Amino acid sequence: MSTDHMQQLVARYLAHRRQLGYELVSSGILLRSFAHFADLFAPGLPLTTELGYRWALAPARLSPRYRIARLGVLRGLARYEVLFDPRTEVMPKGQFASGARHRPTPHIYTIAQVRWLMRDAKLLEPSWSPLRALTMRTVIGLLWCTGLRIGEAVRILDRDFDVRAATLRIVPRKFSPERIIPIHPTVVRALQHYQRERLKLYPRSQHLFVSHSGQGGLSLRTTIEFYFRWLASPLRPKGSLASVRLHDFRHTFATNWVARWSRQSAPLPHHLVLLTRYLGHHKFGDTFWYVQPDRRALRHAATTFQNYRDNSQL
């Protein structure tokens, strides 16, 4: 039996899931960690409940929520592998559960923080990767202005960027439909500037954004997330997580718009439907979680949001 039996299994599973449209960035990291653990302490053996628990519970300092996440990724792997190896055991649900589903409170960025992040991105300008700082600045600005998922931003192709119409085409992915989103003229100019600089270095790339190797997609996302953690490390998160995230730009975008509509006494139900469509959500309830009612301007909006979500058939 190969000494990297579990690593091969995980690689096959991740390739299968990614062909279906799932990115599995954080899940992939966890699964590869488990594979190394299994090949070291149980070489050649199948995925069992006991082995899964040994890995999930190994670091004593882990929170129950993180242990649930570790077991969750193993459960998906086990459901796949049991089709090929009947010795595989699927871990039962409900372990370490603490009642209602918990969603972490995101960080809501201020304008000053976004400006600081974009300004300090120039520190990421090594001589062998002249585009890195500009990539980070432009992507951060785009997420702030549009509320896109980072996975959507790194998959944008040149042909998806319509300068005349001032729009971006977001390709369908997973449970999110294809959509065309309008962008501000300042965003158009920033993207045009980035595109010109990128074409000088990587004229054959079809991706709007690229890494130092000229690649977009998952490779670029991994690079951006790595350097963003370093860049944003001085920021103190206001939410329940240990650090700020790229995904918090999406929460910030939704929260700021709902707050603005509330202050303007705009017809919230109508605008909330538009926000749901804009963010690429199929269900109105999915958008509800993006709005954080932690500001005075949001109290009325949050109540309206809650009532509309509970009574809407969207």
Where are the regions that the model predicts?
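Conserved catalytic core of the tyrosine transesterase superfamily
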Residues: 1-314
